[in-house]
Amino acid sequence: MPSPRRSMEGRPLGVSASSSSSSPGSPAHGGGGGGSRFEFQSLLSSRATAVDPTCARLRASESPVHRRGSFPLAAAGPSQSPAPPLPEEDRMDLNPSFLGIALRSLLAIDLWLSKKLGVCAGESSSWGSVRPLMKLLEISGHGIPWLLGTLYCLCRSDSWAGREVLMNLLFALLLDLLLVALIKGLVRRRRPAHNQMDMFVTLSVDKYSFPSGHATRAALMSRFILNHLVLAIPLRVLVVLWAFVLGLSRVMLGRHNVTDVAFGFFLGYMQYSIVDYCWLSPHNAPVLFLLWSQR
């Protein structure tokens, strides 16, 4: 049988009023038979003081310590200063730019393709028997034969129109040598590893490969000849074919990478635009033509 309900003082709720008649109006009992009311208020106050776990969690989440993301025990300790940032050179670039990735990929493809096309790089290569012919083609695009040939023709020319064309051809060759030497000295890209340094009459900057001087000269001379010499169509095709094969031979001999030759063609094409814009004539350079005619 259930136990009788007891009050806050431990007495049964059903005791007679005579047992507490010694203090009928006592405040402890609420006075005047209000014992049940006191017991009801006591139960309410005890329930109100109880801790609700849900409310406790909400209050903890709203506390400033929890909002800062640190534990309450750690917040009670001494504050720690943040770690100093790493130096700029020690940081790892985890987000490389698209341009950097594209350039690295292009460089890898360039080196791989140049090595595959270097079939005449040595006598023991797959096309080593064609190497002497490629070296002869190399001489046809060298700067010294072109300079000597232009000077000889300029000295032998007896017409003003011929001298004008040859004077500008000499200007184009000197401009080509100057620009190629300047870019090679600035870029300083080494020649391919499979190249043999047995080239014809090299200078100090010829140990660098970017850009290809033979490619720039081939593009410049072919465009110059096609614009200032009246040639039949087969000869015009032969000039273009010579320029293309000369550039290809630079890769087959292992002298240059593919990008060296490609940029050389572009540079030579643009060099002729400079020469055509600064075209020398007896009208804009009379002193130069007068001095040359007196020789």
Swiss-Prot record:
Keywords: Endoplasmic reticulum, Hydrolase, Immunity, Innate immunity, Lipid metabolism, Lyase, Membrane, Nucleus, Phosphoprotein, Transmembrane, Transmembrane helix. Widely expressed. Expressed in most organs, in particular gastrointestinal organs, spleen, placenta, kidney, thymus and brain. The keyword Membrane applies. It is found in: Endoplasmic reticulum membrane; Nucleus envelope; Nucleus inner membrane. The chain crosses the membrane at residues 133-153, 165-185, 229-249, 261-281. It comes from the Eukaryota. Coiled coil: none annotated. Belongs to the PA-phosphatase related phosphoesterase family. It is an enzyme of class 3 (hydrolase). Signal peptide: none annotated. Pfam families: PAP2. GO terms for biological process: cholesterol biosynthetic process; farnesyl diphosphate catabolic process; geranyl diphosphate metabolic process; geranylgeranyl diphosphate catabolic process; innate immune response; isoprenoid metabolic process; phospholipid dephosphorylation; positive regulation of neutrophil activation. Residues 1-39, 61-90 are annotated as: Disordered. Residues 1-132, 186-228, 282-295 are cytoplasmic. The record marks 260 as: Stabilizes the active site histidine for nucleophilic attack. This is Polyisoprenoid diphosphate/phosphate phosphohydrolase PLPP6. It comes from Homo sapiens. Phosphorylation by PKC activates the phosphatase activity towards presqualene diphosphate. The modification Phosphoserine is found at residues 26, 36, 70. The active site is at residues 214, 256. Inhibited by propranolol. Not inhibited by N-ethylmaleimide or bromoenolactome.
